[in-house]
Amino acid sequence: MRKVFISSISMQKVNAFKYDSGVYPENNPTAFPITISLENNCQPGDEVAFITIVTHSEGNLAVENYHKFCEQAGSICREKGARAEFIELAVSARIEAASPRRLYKEIVAKLQDNDEIYADITYGFKYNPIVIFAALNNAYQVRENVDIKEICYGNLYNGSAEIKPEYFDVTSLFYLNSLSGLMGVEGMMGDGGNVLL
């Protein structure tokens, strides 16, 4: 079993903040909210895979931020006695109609049976959270023994200019969506279990 951490890297300058979290009250300052999940869920001997979406273009800081992320996540894994694998999904800053579908296929191809998955939807293009949710749904429905443990995001602003870092767990939305899908299928079933068209 692998513990898989999926996230996107910011294209802008990032700063470390201590995030207020009802899920993990004790956490270290970070610029990458997914590391909060890592710190609190990584155990000695774990096999950890980081699937990270990195936007490549001239003038943005994503590649530099990715190197900082790898250093921080790698350090946490070493401290915990876990083995880390870093998988970079390089994407172009130029968005095309096929970009979301291409990213979806790349994420799905990297997921395996028995994965325990944590995802962070803080950074990235507007379509990234939808793509990540869709890829997780595919893994949950198609792969064997996949567990979607957590979907989180870090928020810095709460309706004012004052920075107020908060860490939110939105995993329940994933499972509500899965249940809605099942209820939709149930509504289409006839007496014999056949789908009504």
What are these regions (language model features)?
Residues 93-97, 121-129:
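Acidic, metal-coordinating catalytic cores used for nucleic-acid/nucleotide bond scission
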Residues 1-116, 137-197:
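Long, low-complexity, Lys/Arg-enriched
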Residues 126-141:
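Short Gly/Thr/Asp-enriched flexible loops that form oxyanion-binding sites at enzyme active sites
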